[in-house]
């Protein structure tokens, strides 16, 4: 895992299955038969320990970066609070300026009053002292000059306050500007290199910054060094693999060169042997041939030694290559078996890079805010100095005004005293007249209270009378309803009686017609006729209703007229 380059990982976290992480793609994987299982177990344990160490280092780095980010957020909150404090101070300065302007206006009014009084005193013939007037005029001139100075300083302060407001508004928009930068892993590594090797403002520490900012920067540099050390370890592993591959290629090239040289030497030896035979046959100098053969033998032995060294280097390189390939295979198996760990590692790397970029942006923003706060502090110091000067001048002006008022109070005219005495007399007279009016009003109020008490009693009596009248009216209505019911019953009974009488008469007439001889007595007929007339008079008397007033006894024809009469009569 430590020797595998970061560029071999894809964006989704999967490792390519066709090509290995190290070495050229055309070379075949070594056989696992060359290694014992103990060596394989040791290598697997080493890889697991390295992987675990890398995980712990990444977790610690993430935790440290998170803590640093929280510290930076707290520091930004402190900066915001300081900015709010500066804003409140600027508001207080504005309020003080407004108060000073109001006081200046009051001073102007007092100056106008003093001018009017001085003119009055100059018009009066009683003024016999000229020196105090000259002193008063000099003091007035001094006050005028002080007022002009105060107005000029007020204008300057207003300009400074407006500039501060503009700067605060412009800086407030860039407080929460935070940009997330997403980029490929290769570009992220390049940005990390630039951050490490750049001599820019990220590493420099200004002299005027506070201790907290310096400690934060040192902590950040330490975290950047830890990340850079991890990246350097990974790169060194990759460079070692590349160096071994290059050494393998060079050794192979040397072997091929040595083989070519050996073949050439063998051909040369055969040629030299043929030439020696010819020379022996021709009997040419045997000593020169022996020396050449010895030299060739020495060259061949040196070449064989070089070949053996190259073979040993090749075997060592092949062993290293086999080990690395086995590690790569184990890592590929592990990656294929646990893709979630790869995703976690990629996420950790991505979060680390993202946090580094965020820290850089936060540092740049912090430096900008520090510069702004320093400018604001300097301007606030200037404002405080000007404010103190204004307060001193204002106090001096107040003292001069108090002295002038004391002098004028000592020079009070008699006319003013007379006017005040006349005003007092008029006020006493007005008070006496108002006191009389108050007494009269109190008497009228007492009478009205007595009238109100009598009115309450009368209202209570009226309510009682009204309740009695309504009760009597309801009783009379009930009696009238009962009378009407009785009249209806009477009418029904009279109709029944008339019907019975008619039936009786008819029966009598029938009986008379049947028994005419028996009923020839005239006295009995007269009695019957008289009885019928009496019954009719009684019925007429019963049908006439009596409507009379209970108070005056007046008889009325209807119940409605009786109700109206009763209301008028009782009230």
Swiss-Prot record:
Subunit structure comment from the entry: Self-associates. Interacts with HD. Interacts with GTF3A. Interacts with MYO6. Interacts (via UBAN) with ubiquitinated TFRC. Interacts with GTP-bound Rab8 (RAB8A and/or RAB8B). Interacts with TBC1D17. Interacts with TBK1. Interacts with TRAF3. Binds to linear ubiquitin chains. Interacts with LC3 family members MAP1LC3A, MAP1LC3B, GABARAP, GABARAPL1 and GABARAPL2; OPTN phosphorylation increases the association (at least with MAP1LC3B). Interacts with RAB12; the interaction may be indirect.
Origin superkingdom: Eukaryota
Residues where Zn(2+) binds: 549, 552, 565, 569
Any one Gene Ontology molecular-function term assigned to this protein's record: K63-linked polyubiquitin modification-dependent protein binding
Location(s) in or outside the cell: Cytoplasm, Perinuclear region; Golgi apparatus; Golgi apparatus, trans-Golgi network; Cytoplasmic vesicle, Autophagosome
UniProt keyword Oxidoreductase, yes or no: no
CCHC NOA-type ZnF: 541-571
A cellular-component GO term for this protein: recycling endosome
Keywords tagged on the record: Autophagy, Coiled coil, Cytoplasm, Cytoplasmic vesicle, Endosome, Golgi apparatus, Metal-binding, Phosphoprotein, Zinc, Zinc-finger
Domain characteristics, as noted in the entry: The LIR (LC3-interacting region) motif mediates the interaction with ATG8 family proteins.
Organism: Macaca fascicularis (Crab-eating macaque)
Function per UniProt: Plays an important role in the maintenance of the Golgi complex, in membrane trafficking, in exocytosis, through its interaction with myosin VI and Rab8. Links myosin VI to the Golgi complex and plays an important role in Golgi ribbon formation. Negatively regulates the induction of IFNB in response to RNA virus infection. Plays a neuroprotective role in the eye and optic nerve. Probably part of the TNF-alpha signaling pathway that can shift the equilibrium toward induction of cell death.
Coiled-coil blocks: 38-170, 233-502
Polar residues bias spans: 201-210
Recorded name of the encoding gene: OPTN
Record region (Interaction with HD): 405-571
Region described as Interaction with MYO6: 406-514
Source taxonomy: Eukaryota, Metazoa, Chordata, Craniata, Vertebrata
Span list, region Disordered: 1-32, 100-144, 186-210, 255-291
Name of this chain's protein: Optineurin
InterPro entries reported for this sequence: CC2-LZ_dom, NEMO_N, NEMO_ZF, Optineurin/NFkB_EssMod
Motif UBAN, chain ranges: 468-473
Free-text description of this protein's post-translational modifications in UniProt: Phosphorylated by TBK1, leading to restrict bacterial proliferation in case of infection.
Positions of post-translational Phosphoserine modification: 177, 198, 336, 520
Entry-linked Gene3D superfamilies: L1 transposable element, trimerization domain, Nemo cc2-lz domain - 1d5 darpin complex
Entries under PANTHER family matching the protein: NF-KAPPA-B ESSENTIAL MODULATOR, OPTINEURIN
Region (Interaction with Rab8): 58-209
GO biological-process terms attached to the record: autophagy; cellular response to unfolded protein; Golgi ribbon formation; protein localization to Golgi apparatus; regulation of canonical NF-kappaB signal transduction
